[in-house]
Amino acid sequence: MAHFLGEEGFRNIGYWPPGTLDQNQASEQLQDYLLNYIPEKKGRILDVACGLGATTRRLLKHYPAENVWAINISEKQIESTRTLAPGCHALVMNAVEMTFEDAFFDSIICIEAAFHFETRRKFLEDAQRILKPGGRLVLSDTLFSAAARHTQFPQLLPSPENHLESVDAYRKLFEEVGFRSVVVEELRDLIWKPHFLRFVTVLHERFADREIGIVQLMENLAMYYELDAMTGPWVVACAEK
């Protein structure tokens, strides 16, 4: 996917308002959209499931390196993060088994990863624990069209226990965990839909230019049509401890 869309270390679908030119811009815009929910960018911030480190690196526009933490379950991705964001605290750690002390962070950001966690509830409970009073959690996430979808890709998705039926159920989960001032926006038409159309267009352009063959075209189209069918709302959320 990165090859087709020209990503530069990002691993997210992006935010695509009118005028967005490419995937890299969309990925940056999604992070910026989330950071707008943190008006005072001070103190310590944690980048959960930081991927290859592009999002962590961009946090350095707002925070000194010593105040930026990043975690990922993949040692390889943490090595990349350490290269892209030198001076930050990049650690191999499971998002549902975080070992930080209580009330350690002022802010937490998590971009398109919570649907991988076993489970969201455990992650939210731990995030609530390690946030300072008044601290904020901001994240983007996707819900799936049915609980059974979680069984289709067991290597990527947790059990159906992680399934949430609706945006209202998503909001309620935050409140049950103890978060307040919960805001959940449904932005599928500005996140997934334009990304999907961009990807399909690029695939056909590469095929027409003979850069890929018919088999690769059909395999990738099948994958993306399946992703479109299995995903439901794409959400952006902000909550305060």
What is each PLM-predicted segment?
Residues V96-I108:
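A short acidic, Gly/Pro-enriched loop at the edge of an enzyme's catalytic core
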Residues N162-G178:
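Short alpha-helix
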Residues L46-E97:
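Class I SAM-dependent methyltransferase SAM/SAH-binding core
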Residues M1-Y15:
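N-terminal, positively charged/glycine-rich alpha-helical extensions of SAM-dependent methyltransferases
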Residues N24-K41:
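Conserved alpha-helix/loop element of class I SAM-dependent methyltransferases that forms part
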Residues V183-K241:
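Conserved Class I S-adenosyl-L-methionine
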Residues L139-E161:
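Short, glycine-/aromatic-enriched active-site segment of Class I SAM-dependent methyltransferases
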Residues R121-R136:
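A short glycine-rich, Lys/Arg-flanked "PGG" loop and its adjoining helix->strand segment in the class I
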